[in-house]
UniProtKB/Swiss-Prot annotation:
This is Probable hydrogen peroxide-inducible genes activator. Residues 8-65 form the HTH lysR-type domain. GO terms for molecular function: DNA binding; DNA-binding transcription factor activity. Pfam families: HTH_1 (PF00126), LysR_substrate (PF03466). PROSITE patterns: HTH_LYSR. GO terms for cellular component: protein-DNA complex. It comes from the Bacteria. Required for the induction the katG gene for catalase. Involved in the response to hydrogen peroxide. InterPro entries: LysR_subst-bd, Tscrpt_reg_HTH_LysR, WH-like_DNA-bd_sf, WH_DNA-bd_sf. Belongs to the LysR transcriptional regulatory family. It comes from Mycobacterium leprae (strain TN).
Length: 311
């Protein structure tokens, strides 16, 4: 039974989060710079005070209980808030103390990371960034479970407990085989997709859903090509080989067209597109820092890519 007067300590919360993230008591103790016995005592005190078992102990590894998994994001948010409070009190100028675990979707990462990483290193030299590329659903799960701090994904996500910061809007362009009659056109109606074999990414990619949504809104019954691709780069190679056409985000077009001698066409207004932004846990104490990071990312990307910053 929990003690209603009990107040968890930051040491206990740090012990809990570290054990979950590192998967072993010894690794967690090393990460926190404390003895394993000290860490075990802090975690045991936390569980005793809460009246809840957070971790199942094993000689080989640890397992997070259902209650522990439910409470993990709140523990992480409390630690983040305390770190932000301490940093502010000390006059800390770094926007993110202790680094940032950033997720990106596969149709964003390869095209903006070179600009982002170089620019962030220059603008925020003390920022420690760890990058993870994955599909939207997996990134949102990682956010909810505390495995990521933030993620660059297509908005809106409309997921409980997740906050969004819009960064930029970008158009889609039509990728065509070399020499295609539509190549170079600037006002292709979206209804033209009805006469073209449309090549889609695998299920789970948000670009696939966005492409099908564009077809639905245009009243188009798309003729789907028999080929599906796991990545945008593979889709482009298939288009170059004459297996169909596909939609590309504007930020990806320069890279992919140079690689593959791809034909490109622009859609007629209103041009279909997407909004990219930064998602993070709404309970996080770092929302102001994430807004600063999002602003810098937008400024960096807009200098290299044809995107429109969201005010």
């Amino acid at each position: 039974m929990s003690d209603k007067s009990y107040q968890p300590t930051i040491a206990g919360l740090r012990a809990f989060v570290a054990v979950v993230e590192k998967g072993h008591f010894s690794a967690a103790a090393s990460f926190l710079g404390v003895r394993q016995s000290t860490l075990s005592q802090a975690l045991a005190a936390l569980e005793s005070g809460l009246g809840v078992q957070l971790i199942e102990r094993s000689t080989r590894r640890v397992f997070v209980t259902t209650q522990g998994r439910h409470l993990l994001p709140r523990a992480q948010a409390a630690i983040e808030a305390m770190d932000a409070f301490t940093a502010a009190a000390a006059g800390e100028s770094d926007p993110l103390r202790g680094g940032m675990r950033l997720g990106l979707i596969p149709t964003v990462a390869p095209y903006v990371l070179p600009t982002m990483l170089t620019g962030l290193t220059h603008r925020l030299p003390t920022l420690t960034l760890r990058v993870v590329e994955d599909q939207t659903e997996h990134l949102l799960t990682a956010l909810r479970e505390g495995a990521l701090d933030a993620a660059m994904i297509a908005l809106p996500v409309e997921t409980a407990g997740i906050a969004e910061i819009p960064i930029y809007d970008e158009d889609f362009v039509l990728a065509l085989p070399p020499g295609h009659p539509l190549s170079g056109k600037r006002r292709v109606p979206t209804t033209a997709l009805a006469q073209l074999p449309l090549l889609l990414l695998d299920e789970g990619h948000c670009l696939r859903d966005q492409t099908l949504d564009i077809c639905r809104k245009s009243g188009v019954q798309a003729e789907l090509a028999n080929t599906r691709a796991a990545s945008l780069a593979t889709a482009v190679q298939c288009v170059t080989g004459g297996l169909g056409v596909t939609l590309l985000p504007q930020s990806a077009a320069p890279v992919e067209s140079v690689r593959s001698k791809l034909g490109l066409a622009q859609f007629a207004a209103p041009c279909p597109g997407r909004r990219i932004g930064l998602a993070f846990r709404s309970a996080s104490g770092r929302s102001a820092s994430y807004r600063q990071i999002a602003k810098i990312i937008g400024e960096l990307i807009s200098t290299e890519h044809h995107v429109r910053l969201v005010a």
